[in-house]
From Swiss-Prot:
Catalyzed chemical reaction(s): tRNA(n+1) + phosphate = tRNA(n) + a ribonucleoside 5'-diphosphate
Gene responsible for this protein: rph
Name of this protein: Ribonuclease PH
Record GO biological process: rRNA catabolic process; rRNA processing; tRNA processing
Gene Ontology molecular function, alphabetical: 3'-5'-RNA exonuclease activity; tRNA binding; tRNA nucleotidyltransferase activity
Entries under PANTHER family matching the protein: EXOSOME COMPLEX COMPONENT, EXOSOME COMPLEX COMPONENT RRP41
Protein role: Phosphorolytic 3'-5' exoribonuclease that plays an important role in tRNA 3'-end maturation. Removes nucleotide residues following the 3'-CCA terminus of tRNAs; can also add nucleotides to the ends of RNA molecules by using nucleoside diphosphates as substrates, but this may not be physiologically important. Probably plays a role in initiation of 16S rRNA degradation (leading to ribosome degradation) during starvation.
UniProt-annotated binding residues for phosphate: 86, 124-126
Oligomer status and interactors: Homohexameric ring arranged as a trimer of dimers.
Length: 235
């Protein structure tokens, strides 16, 4: 039995609030159970130096957690003077996943800057960030069309992107781990897919006990099922 009482193949309650903040071109509050993340997509004129005069735009992502998003308060990374390796890894993952969904040529020499800020953490913050950010990007692209930054017929969005965690908990494959499960899981895996059914990234780690090919296949099957439900629910 899972601590939450959910079935092994059951997502947490999923809720999305669009236009959660008023300044960003795209903004979303995404909630997977008690995990809550604000995702914004800001459109900035110009591109990084390595993209100048290429005719292509760029998309980049940042990720952070509020000090009391966790059970005990943690210091802001700005106060410590540097980002943790975990933060850098997560924001690179978010950026990679989202760039796979956007035709950068179609947005011209503009940059979409994604910010994912965790306001409450209960497991799955990186996967929630990817899903929420994809929604925010779609809203930002629509803003660009409505405000003459893109031709109304332009279609920079190649696909939508969603992500979910799966794992082995108490020797059983489970979907969408919360903090209690994630902390005690024998295996933790994150799966990122697009709305065309393609796999963008898989991150899987055994925690003290290896997992079999059969278990991997079961976890991947659960992830596909969960991501299909996410697309049907919020996209």
């Amino acid at each position: 039995m899972r601590p939450s009482g959910r079935n092994n193949d059951q997502l947490r309650n999923l809720k999305v609030t669009h236009n959660f903040t008023k300044h960003a071109e795209g903004s979303v509050l995404i909630e997977f159970g008690d995990t809550k993340v604000i995702c914004t997509a800001s459109v900035v004129a110009g591109v990084p130096e390595f993209k100048k005069d290429s005719g292509e735009g760029w998309l980049t992502a940042e990720y952070g957690m509020l000090p009391r998003s966790t059970h005990t308060r943690m210091d802001r990374e700005a106060a410590r003077g540097k980002q943790s390796g975990r933060t850098q890894e997560i924001q690179r993952l978010i950026g990679r996943a989202l760039r796979a969904s956007v035709d950068l040529t179609a947005i011209g020499e503009n940059t979409i800057k994604v910010d994912c800020d965790v306001i409450q953490a209960d497991g799955g913050t990186r996967t929630a960030s990817i899903t929420g950010a994809s929604l925010a990007i779609a809203d930002a692209i629509e803003y660009m069309k409505q405000n003459g930054m893109l031709d109304e017929q332009a279609n920079p969005l190649l696909s939508q992107v969603a992500a979910i965690s799966v794992g082995i908990y108490n020797n059983e494959p489970v979907l969408d781990l919360d903090y209690d499960e994630d902390s005690n899981a024998e295996t933790d895996m994150n799966v990122v897919m697009n709305s065309n059914g393609g796999i963008i990234e898989i991150q899987g780690t055994a925690e003290g006990k290896d997992f079999s090919e059969e278990e991997f296949a079961k976890m991947l099957g659960l992830a596909k099922k969960g991501i299909k439900e996410i697309f049907a629910t919020v996209f």
